Amino acid sequence: SRLGVQVVATGRNPVLAKIADPEVAKAAQTYFAHQMPMALGCRDVLAERRGDMVRFEAGALKADVQYVLVTQGRSPRLADLALDQAGVRFDAQGRPLWDRASLRCLDSRVFLAGDATGERPLMHEAAQEGTIAAQQALRAVGDARWQDLPVRGRSVPLSIVFSAPDVAEVGLRFSELPPEAVVVTARGAGNGRSKIMQAPEHVLRLYADPASRQLLGASLLCAGGEHLAHLLAWAIQRADTVEQLLALPSYH
């Protein structure tokens, strides 16, 4: 839409980009709604060819468009693999029972990684899970070269939508926070650089544990937010405290 092309958008989820933090979700929806008409939470969408155009209807949103871009999730296709013959057990929904740390299906020598888990369908997560699963599998078959090596654990969750501004969530999501967690908010309206960039709608939310004073997670809508999210993920994985973070170099 910023290139002069009229764009309309819809999604089945009522929350844009599945943002868990309500303040960040509200800021993102308000901002991007000014960029293009949107209809969220629409389960039924009509896309019907009419001559050289496509009639598009989603809730109250109706438009005749030239092109339709569809993005959809990935569902693991495990039903035809007969994993039960390898000792894999399943839950009531037909999903394998597996250990999140080792990626091993319970009571079996089958390991899941990447999209097969259906849990973190992100490229960097899939790459890391492939390494973990391979190392655990070699241990399981008794490969002596892997027995004494440190076990690689899962990294802190890091999810980024590469938009302008970026949307990112790091560590614990807002819905996963313990009741005692402290939540602090920084907004673009209070930052000189954001004012110059004319970005008052930018927002950063940080979550911390008051007892350990460690950072638990973050959610943000910021220009260049991917870099800030990456640094915050490092800080959370290192179990940095608020004081340690404040002592680090920073700029405006």
Give the role of each language-model region.
Residues 1-51, 55, 121-127, 142-175:
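Rossmann-like dinucleotide-binding cores of NAD(P)H-dependent redox enzymes
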Residues 63, 67-146, 246:
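FAD-site-proximal beta/loop scaffold in flavoenzymes
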Residues 17, 77-80, 120, 194, ...:
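Glycine/Thr-rich phosphate-binding loops of Rossmann-like dinucleotide-binding domains
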Residues 37-41, 111, 182-184:
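General small-molecule cofactor/ligand-binding pocket signal
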Residues 50-51, 85, 92, 210-212:
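Short acidic-glycine loop/turn motifs at beta-strand connectors
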Residues 40-43, 58, 92, 185:
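Short loop/edge segments at beta-strand edges and connector loops
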Residues 162-252:
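Flexible, glycine-rich terminal cap/loop adjacent to redox cofactors
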Residues 12, 115, 220:
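Cofactor-binding loop segments of dinucleotide-utilizing enzymes, especially the Rossmann-like FAD-
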